[in-house]
Amino acid sequence: ATYKVKLVTPDGPVEFECPDDEYILDRAEEEGHDLPYSCRAGSCSSCAGKIAAGSVDQSDGNFLDDDQIADGFVLTCVAYPQSDVTIETHKEEELTA
């Protein structure tokens, strides 16, 4: 399946289609959007975002704890869309505050 991903960035929102077997960060870059990242392995908080709507599968990541995931945080480098999803990007400072 392919879903519509909307990223709400500091520069404004962007939208693109993302297959359910491709990481949101990877697809965003293919579409020409620059997003923050570091490890690309789900082991840090550089790419953190917050889900405003929809759902993702980020089971490949290991940095976020259950409470952070419950609060809506997402690591875009290991997140597969499970529905149409809206994610607020650039949330590392909020996550680590």
UniProtKB/Swiss-Prot annotation:
Residue span(s) of domain 2Fe-2S ferredoxin-type: 3-93
Family, per entry: Belongs to the 2Fe2S plant-type ferredoxin family.
Subcellular location: Plastid, Chloroplast
Bound cofactor: record note: Binds 1 [2Fe-2S] cluster.
Function: Ferredoxins are iron-sulfur proteins that transfer electrons in a wide variety of metabolic reactions.
Record has Glycosyltransferase as a keyword: no
GO cellular component assignments: chloroplast; chloroplast stroma
GO terms, molecular function: 2 iron, 2 sulfur cluster binding; electron transfer activity; ferrous iron binding
NCBIfam families associated with the record: fdx_plant (TIGR02008)
Gene3D superfamilies registered for this protein in UniProt: 3.10.20.30
Name the UniProt record assigns to this protein: Ferredoxin
Principal location: plastid
BP terms from Gene Ontology: electron transport chain; ferredoxin metabolic process
Cofactor dependency: [2Fe-2S] cluster
